[in-house]
């Protein structure tokens, strides 16, 4: 019984990895059909549906992985780092680094891969970015309490600016077919971004 559950979980992971790899390849710039995905995994479409009731559920699982990865790591940053600007830098690096390491998932983050899918999926990505923006805003608001001085500009505006910076570099990464990595020149870019915040 345990072996059967483990095999099912492994097949589910194999399907999700294949979908992420297809999103990373040139196939990712087009609608990915279950027929193409099944052929890529080496199973029938019926076998796909034994593991996932729909392609939407496959995307849901990938989005859940993205959410868990980013939110868990942001929480670790907040636990380990107490100063505001290093926190913001680490969160920014995390988002850009995650995108760079997971090009197929970056197509989901930018909404590119979801153009052909249910609107609800784009709503989940929107909610994820809203959660991250809320975390960034909270980090900025805590600055006055932790360090004795706040920001000169409204934290909501600054949080939006920082997230737009991340989204812009991720979009460029996708648009360039993953040639322009979002973390390249980060050490030179961050002081420019930080200067806008302070």
Swiss-Prot record:
Question: What are the protein's UniProt keywords?
Answer: Cell cycle, Cell division, Coiled coil, Cytoplasm, DNA-binding
Provide the protein name: Nucleoid occlusion factor SlmA
Cell compartment(s), UniProt: Cytoplasm, Nucleoid
Q: In this entry, which stretches build a coiled coil?
A: 119-144
Explain the purpose of this protein: Required for nucleoid occlusion (NO) phenomenon, which prevents Z-ring formation and cell division over the nucleoid. Acts as a DNA-associated cell division inhibitor that binds simultaneously chromosomal DNA and FtsZ, and disrupts the assembly of FtsZ polymers. SlmA-DNA-binding sequences (SBS) are dispersed on non-Ter regions of the chromosome, preventing FtsZ polymerization at these regions.
A molecular function GO annotation:
transcription cis-regulatory region binding
Q: Corresponding gene?
A: slmA
Residue ranges of DNA binding: 33-52
Similarity comment: Belongs to the nucleoid occlusion factor SlmA family.
Q: How would you summarize the oligomeric state and partners of this protein?
A: Homodimer. Interacts with FtsZ.
Name the domain of life: Bacteria
Q: Does the keyword Phosphoprotein apply?
A: no
SUPFAM superfamilies associated with the record: Homeodomain-like (SSF46689)
Q: Which residues form the HTH tetR-type domain?
A: 9-70
């Amino acid at each position: 019984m345990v072996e059967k559950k483990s095999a099912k979980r492994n097949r589910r992971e194999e399907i999700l990895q294949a979908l992420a790899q297809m999103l990373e390849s040139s196939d990712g710039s087009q609608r990915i059909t279950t027929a193409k995905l099944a052929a890529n995994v080496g199973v029938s479409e019926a076998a796909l549906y034994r593991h996932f009731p729909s392609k939407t559920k496959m995307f849901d699982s990938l989005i859940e992985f993205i959410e868990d990865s980013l939110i868990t790591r942001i929480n670790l940053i907040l636990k380990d780092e107490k100063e505001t600007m290093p926190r913001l830098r680490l969160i920014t690096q995390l988002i850009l680094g995650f995108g760079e390491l997971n090009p197929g998932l970056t197509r989901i983050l930018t909404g590119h891969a979801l153009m052909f899918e249910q609107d609800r999926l784009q709503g989940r990505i929107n909610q994820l970015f809203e959660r991250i923006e809320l975390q960034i805003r909270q980090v900025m608001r805590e600055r006055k309490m932790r360090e004795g001085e706040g920001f000169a500009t409204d934290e909501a505006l600054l949080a939006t600016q920082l997230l737009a910076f991340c989204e812009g570099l991720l979009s460029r990464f996708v648009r360039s077919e993953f040639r322009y990595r979002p973390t390249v020149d980060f050490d030179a870019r961050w002081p420019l971004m930080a200067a806008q915040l302070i």
